[in-house]
């Protein structure tokens, strides 16, 4: 089995089936959004593994580290040379091979919805749709103040509630899917993980 086939299989195991879409927010939706918001607000830090499918179909894997509010780090395994760090204000995208760094405002990415200090999906008017399948829920949200910045779809296992995957559609319409595994929540993380440093040439 090749590495690429293994990664594809790992991601497929976490991908979710087709969901029926709720026509409008129901009482069940409101309760679930409150439950999801409470779950996310209960996460101070998280670490684990990820498998990513880029907009071009390229598969990558690595480790991620998250500290709310506003901080996340993706360490990609070779051959992907990327390192992505959000420091609460900016997202730094490193190319470790070329030793370059690009910065974009965190607020211009849909990930800010997941990383904000306090999540309130029921009352922020951010949720576009809620979808359900046996044992799974999928919530698609946008920033209501910046609707053109794209969307994030968060996929949760139910009972117990756990974030398993997110799908980001950026403002160019490009889709990136990230599936999570072996997560640990509320662990001690080095603050330096979330420091954007100019690359040394």
Per-segment meaning from a language model:
Residues 43-45, 59-61, 67-69, 79, ...:
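Extracytoplasmic
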Residues 63-113, 176-177, 182:
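An acidic-aromatic
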Residues 17-20:
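N-terminal signal peptide c-region/cleavage motif recognized by signal peptidases
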Residues 40, 108-122:
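Short, solvent-exposed helix-to-loop capping segments enriched in aromatics
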Residues 23-31:
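Cleaved targeting-peptide boundary
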Residues 122-126, 132-201:
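Gly/Pro-enriched, hydrophobic low-complexity segments
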Residues 38-55:
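A short, Trp-centered hydrophobic/proline-enriched beta-strand micro-motif
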Residues 3-7, 11:
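N-terminal export leaders
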